[in-house]
Amino acid sequence: YFREQGMEAYSLQGGYTGWLLNLIQKEQPGEKENERAREIEKSIRKKFHKVLFSRFAKAINEYDMIQENDKIAVCISGGKDSMLMAKLFQELKRHNKFPFELVFLVMDPGYSEANRKIIENNAKLMDIPITIFESQIFDAVYDIEDSPCYLCARMRRGYLYSHAKELGCNKIALGHHYDDVIETILMGMLYGGQVQTMMPKLHSTNFEGMELIRPMYLIRED
């Protein structure tokens, strides 16, 4: 398959996401952007249906993540996992039996112009209509020495909840997958002496009526 696409036939670590990144980065002058997006969508429907879309749909059904008339903020960081989640949501919406709305939300915590442009270009390439808002979190945690990553993550979550609620959403979706869940458990046991994990869905205690869902909960990274 890869030789037919003009690529070298070598092992792509990371499974679908490795293939997807290679597809995005490969330059093909004159190729229409919507054709690239359709190729990605076709791969989700056929080539990677069992390992991606089936597990995505199973998690949503098994953990009762989506109800009729939900408005979901699909939170996109610009990385491979959140971009994949956005495409899976688009595919789900094509087949779902009840109505729900999607907003593809990108928070700019202080990216450089070049990094922000990469996110915008990749979203356009993959036909994901993103909404971007700014927060300047990077500036806020720049001088903090103790656990800046923890504080940054907390602030990011708060900004996402807040902006999603302003847009009329009742849920935010994050792109954590099965391997992230296992890693969180192991990190807690090894460094914190406690068992802690990521739940597939979580009601917010600070934002009334808001819920966090992780629809990639059953998807393996490899």
Set out the residue ranges of the language-model regions.
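Rhodanese-like catalytic fold shared by cysteine-dependent sulfurtransferases
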Residues: 1-42
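Short, structured coil segments at secondary-structure junctions
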Residues: 5, 126-127, 208
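ATP-dependent adenylation/nucleotidyltransferase module used to activate substrates
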Residues: 32-187, 191-195, 199
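Short, charged, surface-exposed secondary-structure boundary motifs
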Residues: 19-23, 141-142, 206-208
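Conserved, surface-exposed functional patches that form binding/active-site neighborhoods
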Residues: 187, 221-222
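Short, acidic/turn-prone active-site loops that include or flank metal/cofactor-
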Residues: 13-17, 192, 200-202
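A short acidic, often aromatic-flanked loop/helix-cap motif at beta-alpha or helix-coil junctions
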Residues: 17-19, 138-141, 220-221
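Short, flexible loop segments at boundaries between secondary-structure elements
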Residues: 197-221
